[in-house]
Curated annotation (Swiss-Prot):
This is NADH-quinone oxidoreductase subunit I 2. Its cofactor is [4Fe-4S] cluster. It is an enzyme of class 7 (translocase). The lineage of its organism: Bacteria, Pseudomonadati, Acidobacteriota, Terriglobia, Bryobacterales. Its EC number is 7.1.1.-.
Length: 151
């Protein structure tokens, strides 16, 4: 009879809820207001890639050495270049970076001799399509554009 009353009045449920609420102190509960307030990320966080440009002339710093593509364990960086007739240097033609396969290890950033490739602290890289995750040279130079929400 006692077991039946315990099942009817949900005694076990209330005992479990008591244990849960006893260990939750409301003054320690913290909720981030994410879209309105951007969270602070760690200083060494590696996020969205960016191709740096020279502020003096607006050209990319990439010298098309292909070391970043060779250092990448996922083979997601594709660099193509052509030799210039005038300067006799390799000039960057295309640079693609597949962020959907990237594990953000930073080996490509370390391999770059001129610091042209950088992993920034931007973390908003969501896309509705797989093609949106493959960034070309223009997207890498501009960097991700975080959505500004108004509350």
């Amino acid at each position: 009879m006692i077991e039946l009353l315990k099942k009817i009045f949900l005694v076990d449920l209330f005992q479990g809820l008591f244990v849960t609420f006893r260990n939750q102190n409301p003054k320690y509960i913290y909720t981030e207001q994410y879209p309105a307030e951007r969270p602070k990320v760690a200083e060494r966080y590696r996020g969205a890639p960016r191709l740096n440009i020279n502020p003096d002339n607006g050209e990319t710093l990439c010298i098309s050495c292909n070391l970043c593509a060779l250092a990448c364990p996922e083979n997601l960086i594709v660099v193509t270049s052509e030799r210039s007739e005038v300067t006799k240097r390799k000039e960057l033609v295309t640079f693609t970076y597949d962020t959907s396969r990237c594990m953000f290890c930073g080996l490509c950033e370390d391999a770059c001799p001129v610091d042209a490739l950088e992993l920034t602290q931007d973390f908003e890289m969501a896309s509705y399509t797989r093609e949106g995750q493959i960034w070309d040279r223009q997207a890498l130079e501009e960097g991700p554009r975080p959505t500004q929400y108004k509350c």
